[in-house]
Amino acid sequence: MYTIHKDFNFLKNLLTEFLSQPDLIERFQIMKQTKISGWETWFQIELAIFLQQHENVAEWERESRHSLDKRKKDYRNNVSIDFYIRQKYAQESIPLEIKQNEVARKCIRNMINDIAKFRSIRHSSLRTGREPWCLGIHNKVTEKTIRDYLIDYELNYLENCLWIHEVPNTEYMVTLF
């Protein structure tokens, strides 16, 4: 349990810093004003650049491919994990999936599907024993609304490992679980 809380706090602090960057906030505002959609890959690239320069990140990897366990629900033969992030002095990396959808409910559902996808990876293919985390970027809604979605989708999550955060000066927010 200690590792889960430690990973959560590391990711939360890292992402708080990332989402507070003035240039990133300006781009969020422009995307909203111009109605640009489908920017999940852009977000991942921005995060990769941030991770590369961050003093508390020892290494990171993006789009790591894994074989699926055929005994479990079949999505495809292989699947990619968006990020593995290893904190300095840590032995293993933290898997992080990222989802972006303007509609918060759809974003949360897609995040939950990514957790299921991670659980379908063949154990011998995994790089880490760490629990997977999902970060969703969506339009602002109330915290209660997010919690209601999690109940609706029957997601079992640790209450103190849920982070709902408004991206400063934008119409977006993030959810991490």
Predicted regions and their residues:
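Mg2+/Mn2+-dependent nuclease catalytic core
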Residues: V103-S125
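Domain-level recognition of nuclease-like catalytic cores that cleave nucleotide substrates
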Residues: E131-F177
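Acidic-basic catalytic patches of nuclease active cores, encompassing PD-(D/E)XK
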Residues: D7-L68
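Conserved catalytic cores of phosphodiester-cleaving nucleases, focusing on short active-site segments
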Residues: F83-A104, F118
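Short acidic, S/G/P-rich loop/turn micro-motifs used as interaction or catalytic elements
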Residues: N101-K106, V141-K144
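Active-site metal-binding core of divalent-cation-utilizing nuclease and nuclease-like domains
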Residues: I36, T41, A58-A90, I164-M173
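Short helix-terminating capping/connector loops at secondary-structure junctions
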Residues: E59, L126-E131
